[in-house]
């Protein structure tokens, strides 16, 4: 009778340990998501990369050169301060 109880205890203990380990393994081990990213890193194809235009648009004039547009430079700040600090004479 004692041997049967020990055998049942050990069997249940092994079963519980295997069950706990299998749940932890499913929770923490993640295999590569083949559906999310179909490209194989070992054999990349041109479809795997993001396409960029050959000649991206760039405006020829920058704020620092102050040509053809107002970038909110010194003149804009000066106008704002003049309107705020307008002192009646």
Swiss-Prot record:
Task: Tell me, using the record's free text, what induces this protein.
Answer: Accumulates during senescence.
Cellular component per GO, a single term: apoplast
Q: Cross-referenced InterPro entries, in alphabetical order?
A: RALF
Record localization: Secreted
Please list which residues make up the signal peptide.
1-25
Cell inner membrane among keywords: no
What's the chief localization of this chain? secreted
- GO terms for molecular function, please? hormone activity
Q: Tell me the disulfide pairings in this chain.
A: 39-48, 61-67
Alphabetical keyword list: Disulfide bond, Hormone, Secreted, Signal
Q: Determine the domain of life of the protein's source.
A: Eukaryota
GO biological process annotation, one example: calcium-mediated signaling
**Summary of the function given for this chain in its UniProt record:** Cell signaling peptide that may regulate plant stress, growth, and development. Mediates a rapid alkalinization of extracellular space by mediating a transient increase in the cytoplasmic Ca(2+) concentration leading to a calcium-dependent signaling events through a cell surface receptor and a concomitant activation of some intracellular mitogen-activated protein kinases.
Q: What protein family does this chain belong to?
A: Belongs to the plant rapid alkalinization factor (RALF) family.
What PANTHER family does its record include?
PROTEIN RALF-LIKE 15-RELATED (PTHR34270), PROTEIN RALF-LIKE 16-RELATED (PTHR34270:SF3)
- This chain's protein is named Protein RALF-like 5
């Amino acid at each position: 009778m004692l041997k049967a109880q020990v055998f049942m205890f050990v069997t249940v203990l092994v079963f519980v340990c295997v069950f706990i380990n299998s749940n932890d393994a499913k929770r923490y081990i993640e295999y590569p998501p083949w559906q999310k990213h179909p490209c194989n890193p070992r054999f990349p194809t041109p479809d795997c990369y993001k396409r960029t235009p050959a000649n991206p648009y760039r405006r020829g004039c920058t704020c620092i050169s102050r040509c053809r547009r107002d970038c909110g430079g010194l003149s804009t700040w000066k106008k704002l301060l003049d309107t705020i600090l307008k002192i009646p004479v």
